[in-house]
UniProtKB/Swiss-Prot annotation:
Ranges that cross the membrane: none
Protein name (record): Small ribosomal subunit protein bS21
Annotated source species: Chlorobium limicola (strain DSM 245 / NBRC 103803 / 6330)
Family: Belongs to the bacterial ribosomal protein bS21 family.
GO biological process terms held by the UniProt record: translation
Gene3D superfamilies assigned to the protein according to its UniProt record, in alphabetical order: Ribosomal protein S8
Single annotated GO MF: structural constituent of ribosome
Record flagged with keyword Ribosomal protein: yes
Amino acid sequence: MVSVQINDNESIDKMLKRFKKKYERAGVLKEFRKRAYFVKPSVDSRLKRSRCKRRAQRANEESNS
């Protein structure tokens, strides 16, 4: 669980910014979306391969440009 202590003379906005950063770095939302429903291991590996292909194509296009 992500928690943030408010420091002396710190505004609520700064405290919220720190909380949001910690929240993103911890990967809470990403993990929640991943566990929202079950994905079979075979489907997961197929999706991983397609993501890698797309990433490689983008990198290749950027290097050629």
